[in-house]
Swiss-Prot record:
It comes from Cereibacter sphaeroides (strain ATCC 17023 / DSM 158 / JCM 6121 / CCUG 31486 / LMG 2827 / NBRC 12203 / NCIMB 8253 / ATH 2.4.1.) (Rhodobacter sphaeroides). GO terms for biological process: photosynthesis. This is Cytochrome c2. The gene is cycA. Residues 1-21 form the signal peptide. Its main location: periplasm.
Length: 145
C-alpha cells in the first residue's frame, strides 16, 4: 500500500511539471528583445549593461520578474494606470507579462477595472510566442539573485 501511494504521488508530481515549466525559448527571446531595446535596457545592480542601449523611455527591466508593477525605483515615467495596477497587486509573472506586452492599454483597463486606464507603452508585441520567449529570456538574465 505504501508503495502504491508513493508511486501515485510521484506520477502526479511528474504530470504537473509541464504546467510549471516556462513556455518560452530564452535564445529566441534574446533575439526578440531587440524590439524592446528602443525603450528598455537591462542593467544589473552593479551597473553592467546586460542588454539594450542607453534607453530611458521605459524602465530598466533588470529585476522585473516578480516585481510589483510601477515600482522600478529610479524610473519616474510610469502612467497612472500602471501605478494603479501595482497598487491592486500586479506583480510581473509570465501570464500577466504576455498579456500586457500584446496590448498594454487593454490589459491595464481589464486589470484595474478602469475604462479610462491607459498604458504609456504604445508598442504592441504582435506574436504571443515572442512574448513568451522574451519572458523566458528575462527569467535568465534579469532576475536578481
Amino acid at each position: 500500500m505504501k508503495f502504491q501511494v508513493k508511486a501515485l504521488a510521484a506520477i502526479a508530481a511528474f504530470a504537473a511539471l509541464p504546467a510549471l515549466a516556462q513556455e518560452g525559448d530564452p535564445e529566441a527571446g534574446a533575439k526578440a528583445f531587440n524590439q524592446c531595446q528602443t525603450c528598455h535596457v537591462i542593467v544589473d545592480d552593479s551597473g553592467t549593461t546586460i542588454a539594450g542601449r542607453n534607453a530611458k523611455t521605459g524602465p530598466n527591466l533588470y529585476g522585473v520578474v516578480g516585481r510589483t508593477a510601477g515600482t522600478q525605483a529610479d524610473f519616474k515615467g510610469y502612467g497612472e494606470g500602471m501605478k494603479e495596477a501595482g497598487a491592486k497587486g500586479l506583480a510581473w509573472d509570465e501570464e500577466h507579462f504576455v498579456q500586457y506586452v500584446q496590448d498594454p492599454t487593454k490589459f491595464l483597463k481589464e486589470y484595474t477595472g478602469d475604462a479610462k486606464a491607459k498604458g504609456k507603452m504604445t508598442f504592441k508585441l504582435k506574436k504571443e510566442a515572442d512574448a513568451h520567449n522574451i519572458w523566458a529570456y528575462l527569467q535568465q538574465v534579469a532576475v536578481r539573485p
